[in-house]
Amino acid sequence: MRLTGWIGLGLLITTLGLSACATSEPPPPNLYKRLGGREGISIVVGDFVTNMAADTRVNARFKDMKGPEIEKLKSNLADQICDATGGPCSYLGRDMKTVHKGMKITEAEWNATVENLVKALDKNNVGAQTKSELLGALAPMKADIVGQ
């Protein structure tokens, strides 16, 4: 009888342990999902490009771009952000160093670009932690863009 009692107690403890595991919280959504997936990222990118076009500190860089070129830029930017945030996209465009070679982008222009992205994120109510994580994910590109 005692052996049966110990076996029963062992089964009860095992069952409770397994049920605790089964009810554990799912992992938090990744950065891509917190940004609203591809749709949310595309909206932010659209607002970002609008901000850049209106910003006299940087808009001369885009003055010769026409509709299809702007749409390609938006698509490439959305792919980059999607890729950098753990989404299912792959950025297939040229690397940043090649794209920006000879442009001599300044630190001030980089800062204006970051400000315009933050403004787009704020407009779309992206939280502080998510915003900070996104900027951190994109920050390594700076070395391949500024001063090239």
Positions of predicted regions on the chain:
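Bacterial N-terminal signal peptides that target proteins for export
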Residues: M1-G10
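Compact alpha-helical subdomains of small soluble proteins
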Residues: T56, P68-Q129, A137-K142
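Bacterial signal peptide processing site
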Residues: A22-S24
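Post-signal-peptide N-terminal segment of Sec-exported extracytoplasmic proteins
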Residues: P28-L31, L35-S75
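Short, solvent-exposed mixed-charge patches
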Residues: G147-Q148
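C-terminal motif of bacterial Sec signal peptides marking the signal peptidase cleavage site
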Residues: G17-A20
